[in-house]
């Protein structure tokens, strides 16, 4: 279903009902997260499934993130398009009056993404090098830190340099460790 939805292929009647149940189940989980005061992180997947996940995450953020970020979406910054997507969802939130929750990660499907792109004769959606991925990741951090009134950051990284970058920025800007975003 996610592949079909992401490709813009219309659902058949039974698929539409099944998709509706998927959305309902996710919404129930998010409502419970809001009720008990916890965050809900939506994971990222392969690029050909991600448009459907982005659509779901955005609609849930619009619904549940009116006052504070509860719903977070995951951006795999090894993808060439994710920094632009981050800026686009920020604009949507600014215009729509909701908060954005972002979990930044570098990415997990490099070989799979590159192989699929090669087999289909498409350009790879993945940055050409680790250095470019790191640059994209750090640019994402910089963007979010400059927009903390609207965007909340969750870093999913083992990279010490990236974590220290945020800690140093917080220290320099006197942002308390318990800052809500």
Feature names for model-found ranges:
Residues 1-181:
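Positively charged, amphipathic and often flexible ligand-engagement surfaces
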């Amino acid at each position: 279903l996610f592949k079909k939805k992401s490709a813009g292929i219309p659902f058949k009647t039974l698929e539409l009902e099944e998709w509706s149940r998927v959305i309902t189940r996710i919404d129930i989980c998010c409502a419970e997260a809001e009720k008990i005061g916890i965050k809900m992180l939506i994971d990222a997947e392969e690029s050909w499934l991600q448009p459907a996940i982005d659509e779901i995450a955005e609609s849930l953020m619009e619904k549940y993130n009116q006052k504070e970020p509860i719903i977070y979406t995951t951006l795999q910054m090894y993808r060439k398009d994710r920094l632009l997507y981050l800026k686009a969802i920020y604009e949507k939130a600014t215009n729509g009056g909701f908060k954005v929750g972002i979990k930044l990660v570098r990415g997990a499907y490099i070989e799979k993404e590159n192989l699929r792109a090669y087999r289909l004769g498409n350009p790879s959606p993945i940055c050409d090098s680790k250095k470019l991925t790191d640059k994209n990741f750090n640019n994402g951090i910089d963007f979010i830190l400059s927009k903390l009134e609207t965007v909340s950051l969750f870093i999913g990284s083992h990279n010490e340099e990236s974590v220290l970058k945020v800690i140093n920025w917080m220290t320099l800007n006197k942002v308390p460790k318990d800052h809500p975003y």
